[in-house]
Amino acid sequence: WRSIDDRYDGRKIIEEQKQRLVQADERRLEVLRNGLELGEIKVTAADMDDLAFSVAVRNITDGHAVPTGFDAERLMFLDVTVTNGDGAVIYRSGDRDPNGDLRDTHSAYVHAGELPLDEDLFNLQSKFLVRLLRGGEREQVLPINTSQGVLPFVRPEAFPTTIYGRPRGTRKHKQTIDPLGTRTAEYTVPSELLTGAGPYAIDVKLKAQMVPVNLILAIQDIGFDYGM
């Protein structure tokens, strides 16, 4: 970098890479728009008791579900905001905690009781369910069997998983939308939240994310590639 000519050449490379990043973002948006369709907001109730509305999310592809691939890691959710006539936010769903996680059962802030669970969350991310020691199941970020002893040990399956199509100790709770399928998200804003002057405005955004933050937290002790 001592040579000014080298710095100018380096700047040209950086500008070219920035343009390519913009093009990549445009292509990603194009892929999402070709795969999903967000319907119109339908208000089903608007009185002194509550404000209720719904919005349909449709998979407009005929080849595979949405999301596809590693659907237990990929988030596709609705970010919903309701504001009053003064512009104040009176209702949120699909917002993030300070870590960047949705307010679902894997949020550290929800676990600690610092934020309420987002009971209206619309999320197409499938979840792993693992079998517990004394029966029953629970959601887990990583479906890896763990030993109760002090030594790390992954117990191998006693039966071939190819026969059952999945490991017997874990399964996935499917949340994806089938090809050409539709799922409707429904929301209700209770009367105690309908504060301030009207009219009330509803804003709905469909967002996609490759991996949740809680997955990064679960694997960070192992380390990352490229020295990250």
Question: What kind of region is each of these model predictions?
Answer:
Residues 1-228:
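Short, conserved sequence motifs used for protein processing/export or organelle targeting and
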